Amino acid sequence: MLRTMMKSKIHRATVTHADLHYVGSVTVDQDLLDAADLLEGEQVCIVDIDNGARLETYVIAGERGSGVIGINGAAAHLVHPGDLVILIAYGMMNEQEIAEYDPKVVFVDERNRPVELGSDPAHAPEGSGLTSPRSLTFA
């Protein structure tokens, strides 16, 4: 059996521009693509932290070191410059692949530069103001 697992995540990136009159996709700085193990043309889910919008599209490689996170085409109606987003890619894996695979989790700063790389999808970096779901307790 194959399971759909998170393989890559770029967490809390800032949208740098949105262009309604483009053929579609999301443009992402090549440095971020490398860090997250994402390829041009790969399907991603975009989650807008500011307004809750979720959409699927594909990745276009942007200029290395530019910090670009560009929302292109119809998605520009849902996601706007300045919004914080999470980009997530999933992969189909068998049980052996799941046991051996470490997802790529990339945290970025306000200029979309990688500041922390990891593999725990629930990790909240120290000083980020985020809470890991692993730290929640229930009475």
Swiss-Prot record:
Known pathway: Cofactor biosynthesis; (R)-pantothenate biosynthesis; beta-alanine from L-aspartate: step 1/1
Keyword Lyase: yes
GO biological process: alanine biosynthetic process; pantothenate biosynthetic process
The protein's Enzyme Commission number: 4.1.1.11
GO terms of molecular function: aspartate 1-decarboxylase activity
Cystine pairings recorded for this chain: none
PTM (free text): Is synthesized initially as an inactive proenzyme, which is activated by self-cleavage at a specific serine bond to produce a beta-subunit with a hydroxyl group at its C-terminus and an alpha-subunit with a pyruvoyl group at its N-terminus.
Active site positions, chain numbering: 25, 58
Protein residues bound to substrate: 57, 73-75
Keyword Cytoplasm: yes
Keywords: Autocatalytic cleavage, Cytoplasm, Decarboxylase, Lyase, Pantothenate biosynthesis, Pyruvate, Schiff base, Zymogen
Regions crossing the membrane: none
Disordered, as annotated region: 116-139
Subcellular location(s) per record: Cytoplasm
Residue(s) carrying Pyruvic acid (Ser): 25
Record note on cofactor: Binds 1 pyruvoyl group covalently per subunit.
Domain of life: Bacteria
Reactions mediated catalytically: L-aspartate + H(+) = beta-alanine + CO2
NCBIfam families: panD
Quaternary structure note: Heterooctamer of four alpha and four beta subunits.
Protein name: Aspartate 1-decarboxylase
Species of provenance: Nocardia farcinica (strain IFM 10152)
